[in-house]
Amino acid sequence: WPLSVSLWFRIWPLKLCLNGRQPNVNSRYVKDFQLSKKSIEEDLRTLASNIAKRTGKKVAKRLGERHTLTSKSSTTDLVTEIDEWSEKQITEYVTSRRPNDEIICEEGTYIKGKNNIRWFIDPIDGTTNFVYSHPGFSISVGVEIDKETKVGAIYAPLLNELFSASSSHGTTCNGREVEVSKTNELSNALIATGFSYKSEFRGTQAKNLIGILPKIRDIRRMGGAAFDLASVACGRVDAFFEHGLSPWDISAGHALVKNAGGIMMVINPSKSGDYSQPEVNVLKSSSEIYENSITVASSKHLIDQVVELLINSQIDYS
């Protein structure tokens, strides 16, 4: 008899469904199941913003200390023990709240994920600026969902500026909504760029500027790709380009730019290895850039002019 009662209770909800009635399903389960992508993005944006600002304030307190300097790809590619400390702080903070997400960091930390969410983290973007107490360094935290950039947060501690973005939230700086520049003429464009850490590319980049400078308003070199992209997103510069970036350099900035009404594109060399007939694509994921890619960001009405300028400037990093 107890078994028959047990079976009846299990079959009864099914009978209700078959009779056209809906069982009262656990409401918590329904809410979890029906969580919209916007809600997920907002949760991730809030978390990324908190992480960037919390870590950035701690990093700023270490300014002026004697740091252990090492180099990576070249003597100009600096890393300090604070970069590594910041990376550890951020990854521990993320994993404590989102243990199933994938995490990829500049200084080598990699945590394999179990879902469709991936974090790209630059613990200090613009380390040389940090070493010199120059304000152009930042903490950069980007998030992809289903291999598409969705969320970003960049915090510049010495300027106390927190940029954050998601598709449902737009892009803000310290809570104020921002958007890309309305400049639509290349000759009026202020363009930011960065230089390679590799000496063999720096000469080429200097030569490229000879063909670029006469056709634009001016060039700015601030020393950190993340903050450069934040500057595009809020209209402080009209465009940005740089060769040889990595996913963690641009992930957060990508979210800022596209949710501020801008666009990011990637110029890849042709199969023969040159840029005379390059492949030019709209960037969907920061994973789509490679060692020889040129990343370009601006407003949608200026992007084609910037890309054409770069191609016509005889760029060659082979």
Regions picked out by a protein language model, each given a short descriptive name:
Residues 4-6, 27:
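Serine residues within intrinsically disordered or low-complexity segments
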Residues 20-21, 25-124, 307-318:
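N-terminal subdomain of lithium-sensitive/metallo-dependent phosphomonoesterases centered on the IMPase/IPPase/PAP
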Residues 59, 83, 94, 127, ...:
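Residue-level signal for inorganic ion chemistry
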Residues 65, 137, 165-169, 258, ...:
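A short, compositionally biased
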Residues 113-172, 187:
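DPxDG-like acidic metal-binding loop motif
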Residues 179-318:
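An extended, acidic
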